[in-house]
Amino acid sequence: MADPLLPESPLARARWAVTSWRLAAAMWMRAQYSYRASFLLTSAGNLLITSLDFAVLVLMFRHTDRLGGWSLPEVALLYATSAFALGAADLLVGSVDGLGGQIRSGALDTLLLRPAPALAMVCAERFTLRRLGRPLQSLLVLGWAVHRLPGRWSAAHLLMLGQLLVSGTVIFGALFVGGAAIQFWWGEAKEMQNSFTYGGATLLRYPPSIYARELVAGVTFGLPLAFVNWLPLSRILGRPDPLGLPAAFEYASPLAAALCAGAAGLAWRAGLRAYRGTGS
């Protein structure tokens, strides 16, 4: 028998999940904002720490004019787009990487009793706005990079830049959820998951031309991180694709994001079906 609380249409289910996430996240935000000084100091500290990553890139360019043939504003564009995608995904669904701890403590059993989608509840658990520092800082770098690259920004290119930020966020969000799903079977998979999310963002902040062709192929056809920024920015900046792929790949970020989201959703559902609870 179908669950009477479960909306029938996929669109209604999606709205229900978003509403559940929003309500749970708002609850955690109110709890944090009751300690305003601590909240503001933590947020400012997070913004400062994430800024150090870009400072490292700037220091590198004090010793060279080009990195793999890319200028500082071009590399800044790579940095900003990858950092925003990771930061936005971490803000929205990053709490899901603590699933292993929730399974061990029995907290997941409590979340499953709530009349709301389990994934929305896990993603919103202990939601914190201090993670807003990374996407905010990356937007500042993005604005600077766009300003330093005049003459490249037609309406089509600006539209492409906007969609790659959204697609990149979805791709990293899918990596968070897919990696968390593995924790249903392997509770210590968090570090492996981090190597793909945080490690992947670090990889993408540098030009693809400095990496081996095999690595670029691996993050294009294996783990599709190249669709976060390498491929679409190659089109915007007029850079050659190291793999010599058809031009259609440079526009395929939304398709890659949809496929990643679908795969992550299937992995989550499989893990949830396999979960038997702690008996607590």
Where are these regions (language model features)?
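Hydrophobic transmembrane alpha-helices and immediately adjacent juxtamembrane helices
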Residues: 2-280
